[in-house]
């Protein structure tokens, strides 16, 4: 009898060419499917994820699922997978899921975080885990700008021009930045995110924090629907897929408002 297994995994994206399998490159999906292939005595097991992450991007709460005929408890799955996965991937949680659960299509919202180190001196021990932006920033102006992203908008100005997705309307439930000493942490919760959307928003809001732009520019950019008018794409290493929400929309709202 086949069962569907849901896992929450974390990974350090530094030495991966992204999540999705690519020929000749090291990827998170490739490493995970290789472990499952060994556990299934050479049979390929396909893994589905909540979404793809690019090279250098990290995850604390990526969600995946796969179907298997093996009869193991959740704890046995967790131990067996972690015993064979490389050190830069860890399975944090395992449970048997309903047959109609899908890591991507059942998701109601996602949370991304982005970390920025703002000290004058670069921290060599953090260089793979946050962007470095050694400039004086006005946090209140940045949060004023981020609040303008709340609600449902066309985010064309904040997605890569390379995207092939035509529907670029998304709902942003939460967008804010907090400072803990020289470390900034942006938090975004939304119904979905376009390619490079978080990184372009961060790059634009950092310019607002420096005084190069006004917070009101966010509304202008949303209306313009033109990627060329927004700020630069922030580096990959500061980005984390933090959590995927599968609860109903009302619960998502209560979670992000709390």
UniProtKB/Swiss-Prot annotation:
Keywords: Isomerase, tRNA processing
Residues reported to bind substrate: 112
Catalyzed reactions: uridine(38/39/40) in tRNA = pseudouridine(38/39/40) in tRNA
EC code: 5.4.99.12
Active site positions, chain numbering: 54 (nucleophile)
One Pfam entry name: PseudoU_synth_1
EC class of the enzyme, as a word: isomerase
Gene Ontology biological-process annotations: tRNA pseudouridine synthesis
HAMAP family the record matches: TruA
Name the UniProt record assigns to this protein: tRNA pseudouridine synthase A
Provenance organism: Geobacillus kaustophilus (strain HTA426)
Gene assigned in the entry: truA
